[in-house]
Every structure is written in structure tokens, then in C-alpha cells.
């Protein structure tokens, strides 16, 4: 009888070990297959570069492939909607930033950060800057030069903005501050770069890391910093706020999962990101080469950040929807 009891006990323990094989301390057996990071913008932009840089380290940390898929269009809303409507099993993750709010506040879509599970902020982009093509406009050296030109010939000069994204906010703000641009719609940062290089637009906003080579060789010229304060990298470039434009922000690249995703999965993915961001020296070096800033905010901190951004934009919702601040 004792032998029988002992055998049953051993079998029970063996079954328990087998049943829980692959589960972590949180009691979840995840991930069991590849994870798809959806970047709702074209390849080569800020969100894409940051996601791809972290993805290779997440693949090592989570021991499953972490791949990036670009689903561009409509200011990031197509890719965001795809993730929102995906299964909440932890295998589809959205990469987004402050421009998520613009689509919702402007009325382009009826969903926003509230319809996802915020996972974590994983990096901050280098300075966002306003640029001109120096070869196209050799006499424009400052932001005020550009504004004066638009006032002299209202509607002639084109400012490109991604409708429903953060660049639309800039377009509204510079017009409200007195500029007389023809604000035209465009795609994400990759498309805007090609437009300004090809002389198809006169002013655009891009991440400094995307344009540093063009700035150094004299093709593009920076006329303003979109960040809330001057940076160490661009000490001599004034911010829009300094120039009298009521606009300033940073791109905090963020992961979101579909609403209802198991909190344990959210926590495990966030913890993997935190470990890489805070302890992996090679990851930090990779980001710094791209002029990006490693940053981590946990799910609660990320939710609080996005609420504050959303509330700030909702305060000027009518102005955003009208297209011009009154």
C-alpha cells in the first residue's frame, strides 16, 4: 500500500511538472510563438527604427521571434485599428506615441489609448525639428524668415502635416501664431522626408536622427525645435514655444496590447523591456548611435502619461477640429 501511495505521489509530481513546464513565476505559459509588433507608419521612421532596435533584444529575452510589421496609413489609425481588433492573447502589439491622441481628438477615429492595455514607454525619440530645404530656399535662415515669406505670399508655401497625427497639431499652432502656410496632408516621417528632399513641400517636421546627414551636408536646414525645451544636441536651435508658437512635445515610443489582454502577459512583456532598457549596455549604445534616448515607464506610469497628454489636447479639441486655433 505504501509503495502504491509513493508511486501515485511521484506520478502526481511528474504530471505537475509537465503541466507547468514553460510557465514562469507569474503562472503563464507565454509566449509560445512569435510576437508581432505593429508599427502604424512606414519603414524608416522614428517608431519603426525604435521598434526594430528593441525587437532583436526582446527576441533574445523572450526566446521567441519578435518581428516588426509596418501597417501605414491615415496618420497611424489603420495599424492602430488592426491591433485594437486583434485577439487579446499577447501576440499582437502596437507601437505608438503622442500622435495617437490627435486622431481621436480630431475626430478621425472614435478610439484611443483607453481602448488598449498600455504596456510601457520604451524610448524617447531625439528632438523633433522643423526643416526647410536649404537649396530650395537659400535666403531662409530662421523660423521668422519663413513666417515673413508666408505673410508676404499667403498660401504659396506648403507645410506638410500627417492628418490625425502630431504634425497636424504643429500645423494648427504655427498658423495660429501668424504664419500663412498652405497646410497639406502627407503620410508618416519617411514620406515627409522624401517630400522635403524632392522640393515638393517647403517646411516639414522630422526627427533629428532621420535628417542629421542632410543637415550636415547643407541640404536641409533646421529652423526650430518642436521639443518643450532646448536640447544638448541642438543648443542653438530655439523651440517653437520660444518663437511664440503654443506647441511642444516629445515622442515617447510606447507599446500597447489589445484591451483585455491578461495582466500577467502585459507585466511579463513590460518586465522584459525594463530589463533590456535598464541593464543591456549594447542596446543603449545602439540607441545612442541613432540619437534616441532609452526610457522606461511601467504600465501605470504609461497610462498616467497618456491621460495627461490626452487631457491637454482635449482642452483645445474645438480648435483642432476646426483646423485653426481661434
Predicted features by range, described:
Residues 1-4:
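Positively charged n-region of N-terminal signal peptides that target proteins for export
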Residues 21-117, 166, 178-203, 286, ...:
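N-terminal (or domain-start) structured segment
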Residues 32-34, 176, 181, 263-326:
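An extracytoplasmic/periplasmic, membrane-proximal ligand-sensing/linker region
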Residues 80, 144-147, 193, 212:
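Short hydrophobic/charged patches on amphipathic alpha-helices used for structural packing
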Residues 126, 211-280, 285, 308-311, ...:
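C-terminal lobe and pocket-closing loops
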